[in-house]
C-alpha cells in the first residue's frame, strides 16, 4: 500500500490483487451485467458498459467472462442487482461512503452494518456524510499515457474540470454528467483509461494517525471482502510515513 496517490488515499485499493483476484473478477463481472441491463447490451451504444469493459480488460478479466456477463444481462438471466449506498464513520472520525450492488437489500445491509460496527465505525442515515463530498466523474490513467503537461493539455481540451498527476499516474476529474463525453474525447490522445467512473471526492480530508489508520484500513479491507460491496470512498489522508509503517 506504500506509494498511495491522492486518489488511492480517497478510494482504498480493492485488496491485495494477488490474493483477491477472484473476488475482484466477481465485482467487475457484476458491474458489467448491471451496466448492460441499464442500457443496451452493446459497449458501442452504452457508455457505462463500455467503461466497465475497459476497466475489466485492464484488470485482466478474461474475454469469455466479459462476454458471459454481457450475455447474462441481454438474456435476462441471473439475479437482478440494484445500486445501494451506505454512509457512516470509521475510526478517527473518517467519513465513509460504501457503494454496493446487491440482489438482497436485507443481506447486504446486515453484513455492512456488522462489518462497520465490529471495526470501530458506525453507519448513519442516508445523506449523513455525502454532503461533505462532491459527486464527480473520475478518469484514471497510468504514467504511460504521457507526462503531466501532456495529460493536462489533453484534459483541458476535452473539457475536464481538474487534473492531478503524481508518481502513481493521472487523475482527471469531470462534471458528473460529462464523464463519458470527456473520456471519449481523451482516448484519441491518451488511449483507453485505466478506469472511468462516477466518484465521491471529499471537500476536506482528515489526516489519520498510525493507530486509527491501521483500524481504518482493516475496516475497509473487511468491507471489500464482502461480495456485494463495490467501492469504499472516504475523506481520509494517510501520511506516507504511516503507510510505510503499516506496510
Swiss-Prot record:
Pfam families: TACO1_YebC_N (PF20772), Transcrip_reg (PF01709). GO terms for biological process: regulation of DNA-templated transcription. Keywords: Cytoplasm, DNA-binding, Transcription, Transcription regulation. GO terms for cellular component: cytosol. Gene3D superfamilies: 1.10.10.200, 3.30.70.980. Residues 1-21 are annotated as: Disordered. SUPFAM superfamilies: YebC-like. Belongs to the TACO1 family. It is found in: Cytoplasm. This is Probable transcriptional regulatory protein Swit_2142. Residues 1-14 have a biased composition (Basic residues). One of its GO terms (molecular function) is DNA binding. The keyword Cytoplasm applies. InterPro entries: Integrase-like_N (IPR017856), TACO1_YebC-like_2nd/3rd_dom (IPR048300), TACO1_YebC_N (IPR049083), Transcrip_reg_TACO1-like (IPR002876), Transcrip_reg_TACO1-like_dom3 (IPR026564), YebC-like (IPR029072).
Amino acid at each position: 500500500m506504500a506509494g498511495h496517490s491522492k486518489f488511492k488515499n480517497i478510494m482504498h485499493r480493492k485488496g491485495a490483487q494477488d490474493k483477491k483476484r477472484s473476488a475482484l473478477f466477481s465485482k467487475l463481472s457484476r458491474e458489467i451485467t448491471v451496466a448492460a441491463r441499464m442500457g443496451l447490451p452493446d459497449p458501442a451504444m452504452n457508455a457505462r458498459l463500455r467503461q466497465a469493459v475497459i476497466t475489466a480488460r485492464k484488470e485482466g478479466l478474461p474475454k469469455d467472462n466479459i462476454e458471459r456477463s454481457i450475455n447474462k444481462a441481454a438474456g435476462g438471466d441471473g439475479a437482478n442487482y440494484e445500486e445501494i449506498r451506505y454512509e457512516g464513520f470509521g475510526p478517527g472520525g473518517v467519513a465513509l461512503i460504501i457503494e454496493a450492488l446487491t440482489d438482497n437489500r436485507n443481506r447486504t445491509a446486515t453484513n455492512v452494518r456488522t462489518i462497520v460496527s465490529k471495526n470501530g465505525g458506525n453507519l448513519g442515515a442516508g445523506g449523513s456524510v455525502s454532503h461533505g463530498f462532491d459527486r464527480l466523474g473520475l478518469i484514471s490513467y497510468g504514467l504511460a499515457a504521457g507526462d503531466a503537461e501532456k495529460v493536462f493539455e489533453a484534459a483541458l481540451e476535452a473539457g475536464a474540470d481538474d487534473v492531478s498527476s503524481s508518481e502513481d499516474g493521472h487523475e482527471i476529474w469531470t462534471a458528473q454528467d460529462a464523464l463519458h463525453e470527456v473520456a471519449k474525447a481523451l482516448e484519441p490522445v491518451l488511449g483507453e483509461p485505466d478506469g472511468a467512473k462516477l466518484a465521491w471526492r471529499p471537500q476536506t480530508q482528515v489526516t489519520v494517525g498510525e493507530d486509527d489508520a491501521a483500524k481504518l484500513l482493516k475496516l475497509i479491507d473487511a468491507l471489500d471482502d464482502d461480495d456485494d460491496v463495490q467501492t469504499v470512498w472516504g475523506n481520509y489522508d494517510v501520511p506516507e510515513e504511516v503507510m510505510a509503517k503499516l506496510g
